Amino acid sequence: MATAQLQRTPMSALVFPNKISTEHQSLVLVKRLLAVSVSCITYLRGIFPECAYGTRYLDDLCVKILREDKNCPGSTQLVKWMLGCYDALQKKYLRMVVLAVYTNPEDPQTISECYQFKFKYTNNGPLMDFISKNQSNESSMLSTDTKKASILLIRKIYILMQNLGPLPNDVCLTMKLFYYDEVTPPDYQPPGFKDGDCEGVIFEGEPMYLNVGEVSTPFHIFKVKVTTERERMENIDSTILSPKQIKTPFQKILRDKDVEDEQEHYTSDDLDIETKMEEQEKNPASSELEEPSLVCEEDEIMRSKESPDLSISHSQVEQLVNKTSELDMSESKTRSGKVFQNKMANGNQPVKSSKENRKRSQHESGRIVLHHFDSSSQESVPKRRKFSEPKEHI
């Protein structure tokens, strides 16, 4: 019987460098991590349609990477933002990227969910925290450790996005870039960005802050954090989160300084990825069926010239475009396939969320909590720092 073996072409295969001995190799890795993180988040949160992604392989993990697509202007715009991030990253100006989701096109400062990607530049080669907190300091690290940390971070993002409650049907995206002011020229702006007007944002509902993870090389440190509404965490599997949780006080402001990450006002819900991965290893068949495709490639962002074989199932098309009364409004389904039951009253009317009640009480009392991405708790008045926002929103 004739058999055929599927070969991964060099263009479709993505591998980490065998070793990270130069700053350029480290930069390529960090770019890949940023690309696959953003792609994973936007794909699993259902922000763009299936056609906006192409398929790539991260070792044995099939992943999706965001690409320019003439039929999806939003994905094309986000690709341009990413290229602007790369420009600032290469110049060592970029300190943090904030990708925020909001629901009112007229009010991009009121957000519903956001993702923070933080960057540090170093020549000391710090070790990665995911192995052990008691490790001795070394001047270099094994590339296998970097590779393991990178895959671990991607899997953490995947599992968190898979288990979060769904976003509203219609959402918009914006991005804010923060810099190291001491080295960034005052007039510098990456391609596609302009000087920002409002440093802080208003967060809808009660925020939950999550430290997803980090990857370190001898030249860079890359961290990922997520802020979402607590209501989206209600149905999350308790085994996914680390048992060492700190309760979030209502409407606490996140002071996003590394030195404050261990303070009480910052919720540190670390993802317990090992437990989830062990469950998947015990049941590999179900894991293979449930794990969606995520991705990255050599230059991180695929171009619209490529035409990978993508298939869109009927259920996915319905999820993206069918908004008729025939839809069952008692439940919603994420792209990962997980079904969430909507809260209903009297069998047919949705229950008003506590988020809506909180927003109403805030407006009635005149209290609006400002969420500062970039300020110190020791500053009575947050210092005005340079940051950028897109010339065009999605």
From Swiss-Prot:
PTM-bearing positions, type Phosphoserine: 376
Predominant cellular place of this UniProt entry's protein: nucleus
PTM (free text): Phosphorylated at Ser-377 in a SPO11-dependent manner.
Disulfides per UniProt: none
InterPro entries: HORMA_dom, HORMA_dom_sf, HORMA_MeioticProgression
Keyword Phosphoprotein appears in the UniProt entry: yes
Pfam families hit by this protein: HORMA
Compositionally biased intervals (Acidic residues): 288-300
Keywords: Chromosome, Differentiation, Meiosis, Nucleus, Oogenesis, Phosphoprotein, Spermatogenesis
Tissue: Testis-specific. Over-expressed in carcinomas.
Gene Ontology process terms (BP): blastocyst development; meiotic cell cycle; meiotic DNA double-strand break formation; meiotic recombination checkpoint signaling; meiotic sister chromatid cohesion; oogenesis; regulation of homologous chromosome segregation; spermatogenesis
Domain HORMA: 24-226
Chain ranges passing through the membrane: none
GO CC annotations on file: chromosome; nucleus; synaptonemal complex
Composition bias type Basic and acidic residues, residue spans: 253-282, 362-374
Motif (Nuclear localization signal): 383-386
Domain of life: Eukaryota
Polar residues biased stretches: 310-324, 343-352
Subunit-level organization: Interacts with HORMAD2. Interacts with IHO1.
Functional summary from the UniProt entry: Plays a key role in meiotic progression. Regulates 3 different functions during meiosis: ensures that sufficient numbers of processed DNA double-strand breaks (DSBs) are available for successful homology search by increasing the steady-state numbers of single-stranded DSB ends. Promotes synaptonemal-complex formation independently of its role in homology search.
Protein name, entry field: HORMA domain-containing protein 1
